[in-house]
Design a protein with these regions (language model features):
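N-terminal Lys/Arg-rich, disordered targeting/topogenic segments
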Residues: 1-7
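Hydrophobic alpha-helical segments, especially transmembrane helices
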Residues: 8-9, 58
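Hydrophobic membrane-insertion alpha-helices, especially the h-region
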Residues: 10-27
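Aromatic-anchored segments of alpha-helical transmembrane domains
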Residues: 20-24, 165, 185
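A structural signal for short, hydrophobic/glycine-enriched beta-strand patches
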Residues: 30-175
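A transmembrane-helix-recognition feature enriched in membrane-embedded lipid enzymes
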Residues: 173-199
Length: 199
């Protein structure tokens, strides 16, 4: 009898957990911004932080910087094995970008994850007395980025620019994109839990 009750409790607990995870996953998906019709009026922040990872993030950050060279750009999470000159060489035929590298672009080679990105961005902004930042990253990454950056920054000091990954934004459902979203959700879930318990 006791065994049957325990088994029933186990089934109910498992079922409730599935419901909770499903609801939370749906919430995560709802937090992924569209990359179309974005409001770009906030590009005049004091600084721009590009989180390395998917393609187009760095080029998007540089394009924003070109619109206002009074800003400063941090490329965060650069592989330690990649030299600054190697990155600059990618823009060898772009005179304007080469000039920006000489005056307005910094590299962070310490960060290896999103938490460290947020921490190093905080140190960078503090040292350069930057009050507002535009964070540039892939759209599916933004929900977790908001959580991690909230550890160091006030909400009203941060703005976000989501970079398109899939060809047709959310409507382009590919195996690779589904895999990325699932793995990113697992990280998002872990980060969410870390605000409740120390992990």
């Amino acid at each position: 009898m006791i065994h049957q009750i325990n088994k029933k409790i186990l089934y109910i607990s498992f079922f409730l957990m599935i419901i909770l995870v499903t609801v939370h996953f749906t919430y995560y998906l709802s937090q992924i911004p569209s990359t179309t019709n974005q409001n770009n009026t906030f590009i005049n922040t004091d600084g721009i932080v590009v989180l390395t990872g998917d393609k187009n993030r760095i080029s998007e950050g540089i394009n924003i910087l070109k619109k206002n060279s009074n800003q400063r750009l941090l490329i965060s999470g650069v592989n330690k094995k990649i030299s600054n000159s190697a990155i600059k060489s990618l823009y060898a035929n772009d005179t304007e970008t080469r000039q920006l590298f000489n005056c307005c672009i910094d590299f962070d080679k310490i960060s290896t994850n999103t938490f460290e990105n947020s921490r190093e961005a905080y140190f960078w902004a503090r040292d350069r007395q930057l009050k507002t930042l535009l964070i540039v990253t892939s759209n599916y990454h933004i929900p977790r980025v908001k959580l991690e950056f909230s550890r160091f920054f006030q909400k009203d000091s941060l703005y976000y620019k989501s970079v398109k990954v899939a060809k047709n934004d959310k409507s382009d459902i590919s195996i690779e994109m589904i895999r990325k979203i699932i793995f990113e959700y697992i990280k998002y879930l872990r980060t969410s839990l870390s605000f409740l318990v120390k992990i």
